[in-house]
């Protein structure tokens, strides 16, 4: 039994070694027992437990004596209760709540529940399902284990035979009896691990011997085994032509070899001069005389390699300092420089979410982590609740509070666990043996390991270190060999390059010689070929001439045939022409009839158009005539009022002047008229007497009557003259009022007036008739009377001349005034005519300009617009998105050599009309705005390229007219067609908000249509105007608050977005 006890003790210690952590591994440098023990003590003393830390399996880590354990404080003893099961037996006091299996204190009474087990008589079986502990060794069920003979294998296949565990029972089992022996082909044979078992394994028994062709023979690595291997046995001796002869490497064996006997001497131009290798011979060579100095930009400056010369170089002067962002700062590697770096200064602290917090690794940091601080408490649903692991939490869990009672069919019945219920169950009836013996041995050797185990561990570690050192030495040796081989290869390459260069030179010279020879041969061959070609050409020429003759004869025959064919063709052509003529005549008749019908239709259409045009022209002419008449009436009324005012002024002035002149003339004429009247009265009395005497009417009466008539005519003439004089005076007064006091009289008129004066003087002389005296007897009296009469006549003549001179002056004045008045009236009339003509011209030019504007705005070609319409229509209906490139390609049709129709309003009108007709009913606002955003680029492109002033007004007026023609339809119960189109025009940025407001305010010819549309646009118009008011109110509020809190306003202005107004519109739109 003693031997068995020792073996068990050894196995337990080995298991403790495997459970050891990496922190308490033994150092390889310390070999003695004292050093290991002291170090372990020092580690344990200095190690401080952190908060909520529980140390497990501590009794095999410590090497203290039992005396030292007893001297510790109460706190440490309480901690050790949890740590070691040995101390638990001594110091732990059982409480009433704790159930201990196998307890024999029957005197202590416990409060039993219904489900609790009565441990007073635990051995007796109470239920059928309970285990009968009285005889636990006996197997009760087929599935129970038979503990009476646990060592014996009960099942052939599944059970392990513990009676002889070391022996292998199955093919797959490990044979622990002699684990060193190899049982399978794939297993290693530990009995003699050096022996090779497989082809691929290394034979460690004699690793020096070569087993495969590819293996190195380490037994005599110097001997060459393959053709390609180096023979290290006598590496100095040259075996192949290509090998170096190391026996006397200094002696030159080949021409190409380096002569190492005097390697310092330079033999070739290209060779290095080793006599003074430090001196630089070529530009490309390194100058070894001062290799530390930097000679090129790309070279390293070895004089001070620590200093950084380039941006990319490492600064060796202080390699610890960080030079780049990506470099580690070795000066203080513990400090974290980047976000992604670990902070080594305090690696225990958690820096990222994904990192472990080593400061308190027991605490749970993530949802998926276990909370080691209180591992007993349940953190997740799936975790076990260790705080009260005895209580059953789920249906599938074991109820440890009453673990003895079997709850399910598949559960073990611990109430009588000693009894074997099934064949597969263990028999615990004799399970208590071999427990005390092990515990005693463990108590004696708890604190310390045996010496041979420690030495074994040290020996193993030394072995490992030696093997590692050997491996490193081998690797270093191999590296040196590889470096030598690479150096040699480089030298061979350089030599090979030099040989190749020399060979190339020789080949070039040979090629030159060969070229010269080839040239001479080619020249001779060319001469021979030329002669041969000449002879062949002559023969071919002869043959060609003969062929030409034959061809000429054939051509003649062909010409004759062609003539015949031509005659036949002419006849056929005549027949065809006649047929064609008849067909053409019939077609012409049909075409004429069709043309006549078309012409009639066109004429009808033209007549209708002409009628419409005539009606339009008549209306325009009537309107113009009305306007002209109204203007003429206004002008006439103005002239009449002016004339009245002037007449009244002139009448007053003329009356006063005439009165004064008449007074003067009357006073002068009184004397003359009195003398004449006396003579006439005498004559009349005399005549009356004669008439009374004679009853018949004599010739004198007739003459008198004639004279009276003449007088009446003269009086009428005088009256006319007076009237004319008055008119002349009026004209003079008008001229004075107009500022024309000086009148211009032509010279011809003056001469004419002088001649008239002379004629009047002559007439006066002839008119003086001599009066005959009836009484011939009284001649003397008559002579005296004649003398008196002559004197009187002279005086009369003088008076008459004076009168006539006055009248002439008045006449001249009146004639001149008439001429001036006529010129003034003509000038006034001309001015008025010119003014009227100018006004008419202005109206006509205005109308022409309006017509030109209208034509420019609506200029179009029908075919081009049709093509444009056909291309756009399907895309707009399919809700196609127009890019900038699509707009350019589609609108390229509108540009022609004659005219650019993009400048007009027609293409825009076509697009918007198609869009209006393509809008479906009963859609949401978002869908309409998506459609508008698809067509937005095309509308903006057409508007930008148009050259129309106030284009926005034309767009709105035309959309309004189009909606009026459609009779203002509704797309849904809430929205109408006009509202959606106005929204699209505003949302797409084609028409600005201010232009909408101005359009509503303007009074145009479309005022009636606007008033109709306002029935549907009332709320839309309110929305526009209210926004402006809101903005103005906001601005006023800001102005008021600026005076109070300037800082608050500045913060608000920063936070307000640039497109604040547009965002507000957007919210109301959507």
From Swiss-Prot:
Protein name per UniProt: Uncharacterized protein PF3D7_1120000
Keywords for this protein: Coiled coil, Merozoite
Biased composition (Low complexity): 73-83, 773-786
Biotech use, per record: Possible candidate for an effective malaria vaccine as determined by epitope response in sera.
One GO CC term, this protein: cytoplasm
Annotated stretches, region: Disordered: 66-88, 355-388, 423-483, 667-692, 735-786
Skewed-composition ranges (Basic and acidic residues): 435-460, 474-483, 751-765
Coiled coil start-end: 475-736
CDD domains: W2 (cd11473)
Lineage: Eukaryota, Sar, Alveolata, Apicomplexa, Aconoidasida
Keyword Lyase: no
Superkingdom classification of source: Eukaryota
Compositionally biased spans, kind Polar residues: 735-745
Species per Swiss-Prot/TrEMBL record: Plasmodium falciparum (isolate 3D7)
